[in-house]
Every structure is written in structure tokens, then in C-alpha cells.
């Protein structure tokens, strides 16, 4: 009458399933929170004065109380912190039930408030993050800075191998050039490998996302 697919025949099994759905949900939203936390941490790192890869407008950042030039990524720091709390939820649930015998226990009532609160929090974090990330400003020509020239060393090594060098000889040549300060990186590469910087396959990723959400 209630539309369930089947009946749970064993009462003990039914009782022992209490809290398992909440744990599954905690793991799922914890996984999502992990992605948001790392993304936010990367943003905070890339905004540092030493890197300065990206920036955000004043509406997304706050000023420092003592440093007039500083723009703090408070939004992303708070998302990171909140998402780290959400990731700890499964540990809380495990500890709540760690010494319970089979059967019903009132302790499991404590799951309810925490799971509802965490779902609200992760939805808020997603909404705030999606709004904020659309305001991102990426500094152009970052790799023109001389301090990043060595990021091309592997590409240049691979090009030598493709031209007929053995890997060892190509490695030694690039290494010697770097040691002797003779290394001049070639920066114009045309990548075609799926997923590479020259072929990100964004359309394919979008299709996969739509399939997952539908």
C-alpha cells in the first residue's frame, strides 16, 4: 500500500539498518564538501601575493585590519572551513553508534539534526561558491614571468625525444642547459591529447554531467 518494492522480513536486520541511510548521506555530502574545500584552498593559495594568479572584486573579498593593500579571500576560507566540518560528520556518526548493541537506541536521534544541518550547509556553500567563482579574474601572461620557465622543461625534453634523441640523452641535455644557465624554453605547443591543455573536452564533460544529473 505504501509503494515499497519489497518487505523487510527480518526485524533485527531492519533495526540494525537504523542510521545507515544517514551515514550514506554523510559520506556523499562529505565527498562533495571535500571537492569544494580543496577548490577553495587552491583559490586562497593562488590569491597569495607570492603567486597572484587570480583575484576577485571587492564584493567577494575583505580588507585587512592592518594592511591596506591586502584583500582577504574570506568567502573561500569560510567555505573551506565549513566543508571541513561537513567532512567530519561521518566520524561523528560512527562514534555515536560505536558502542551500541543491536536494536533501537535513542542515541540515533542525534543523527537527524546533524544531517539536516549539513545538507543545508552544503547547499549554501554550493550557492555561495557558484556565485563567487563567476567573479574570478585570471591574470594574463603568467607564464611569461621568467621564474616559471622551467615548467616547460619536460615538454622540451619530450620534443627532443620525438625528434630522435634517447630519453637519457634528452634529459641530460636539458639538465645541462639548466645548470649552465643556457636553457631557453620553447613555449608554443599544440596539444591534441584528450584532456590536455589544448583539448580540454569541455563539451564532453558537460554531456557527462548532464547524464549524471538526469
What do these predicted regions represent?
Residues 1-96:
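Internal glycine-rich alpha/beta core junctions
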Residues 67-214:
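Glycine-rich cofactor/substrate-binding loops
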Amino acid at each position: 500500500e505504501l509503494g515499497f518494492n519489497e518487505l523487510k522480513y527480518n526485524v533485527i536486520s531492519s533495526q540494525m539498518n537504523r542510521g545507515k541511510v544517514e551515514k550514506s548521506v554523510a559520506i556523499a555530502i562529505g565527498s562533495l564538501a571535500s571537492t569544494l574545500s580543496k577548490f577553495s584552498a587552491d583559490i586562497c593559495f593562488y590569491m597569495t601575493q607570492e603567486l597572484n594568479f587570480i583575484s576577485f572584486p571587492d564584493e567577494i573579498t575583505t580588507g585587512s585590519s592592518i594592511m591596506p593593500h591586502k584583500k582577504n579571500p574570506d568567502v573561500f576560507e569560510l567555505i573551506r572551513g565549513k566543508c571541513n566540518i561537513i567532512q567530519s560528520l561521518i566520524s561523528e556518526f560512527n562514534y555515536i553508534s560505536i558502542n551500541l548493541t543491536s536494536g533501537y537506541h535513542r542515541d540515533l536521534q542525534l543523527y537527524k539534526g546533524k544531517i539536516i544541518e549539513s545538507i543545508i550547509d552544503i547547499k549554501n556553500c554550493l550557492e555561495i561558491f557558484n556565485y563567487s567563482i563567476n567573479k574570478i579574474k585570471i591574470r594574463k601572461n603568467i607564464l611569461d614571468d621568467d621564474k616559471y620557465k622551467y615548467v616547460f622543461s619536460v615538454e622540451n625534453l619530450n620534443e627532443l625525444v620525438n625528434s630522435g634523441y634517447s630519453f637519457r640523452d634528452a634529459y641530460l641535455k636539458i639538465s645541462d642547459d639548466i645548470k649552465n644557465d643556457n636553457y631557453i624554453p620553447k613555449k608554443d605547443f599544440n596539444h591534441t591529447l584528450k584532456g590536455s591543455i589544448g583539448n580540454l573536452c569541455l563539451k564532453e564533460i558537460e554531456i557527462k554531467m548532464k547524464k549524471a544529473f538526469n
